[in-house]
Amino acid sequence: MKNHFEALVDGLADQGYAIVDNFLSVKEVVAILELDEFKNAVLHFKKAGIGKRHDKQINESIRGDYIQWIDKQKSAEPLTLYLKRLEELIQYINQTLFQSLKDYEVHMTVYPAGSFYKRHLDQFKADDHRKLSVICYLNTNWKEDEGGQLRMHLPAPHLPTLRGEGGQERTKDVFPTAGRLVCFRSDQIEHEVLPATRERLSLTGWMLDQLVELRYL
């Protein structure tokens, strides 16, 4: 796992995003998919909204996924394994990139076939505690012609990476292959989810510079 951590840190430092495969093994992905939460997820999860707290609204013309937040204190063992791995990654990022990440939040996500999420930024204007976005995909045997890619709109040259360097504006597509993890700057990288021809599953989260329970105090 240390090799994965090193690759993630190098990517974040150099270009503001990183992608690694096999962050979760196929066996670990299957164990998550077999949880009751992911069986008939569209029926059990809540329709995701846009905005935060009191300003939140449902708008399927912008966002079409369903989510269920993970309770870190009560999560099932397959999810706990993933969360512990995230905690180790946070510690590694803090040590190597001199960040001050203090907590994280994660929800289970399902996009029904044909649904999407239009271009957006993860960090809210009124709440800048989301520093890094992190997504782990749970889709076995995914084929590129099924679509569903995450499209990142990479920052213009005047927006620095964690090492203070910029890059040309361009897009980067990431297909939602099982076990693949993508991590990127929540404050800089706008992104969108393109429609897929089949259901698309992931664990979607954010690394924070504030404890979750203190964010709204």
Where are these regions (language model features)?
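Phosphate/oxyanion-binding loops and surfaces in catalytic or ligand/nucleic-acid-binding neighborhoods
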Residues: 35, 39-41, 96, 141, ...
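A short coil-to-beta-strand element that immediately follows conserved catalytic motifs
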Residues: 99-107
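Catalytic core of Fe(II)/2-oxoglutarate
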Residues: 125, 130, 139-162, 167-217
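Amphipathic alpha-helical recognition patches that constitute DNA-binding helices
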Residues: 19, 107, 133, 202
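Conserved short histidine dyad/triad with adjacent acidic residue
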Residues: 108-125
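Non-heme Fe(II)/2-oxoglutarate
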Residues: 3-92
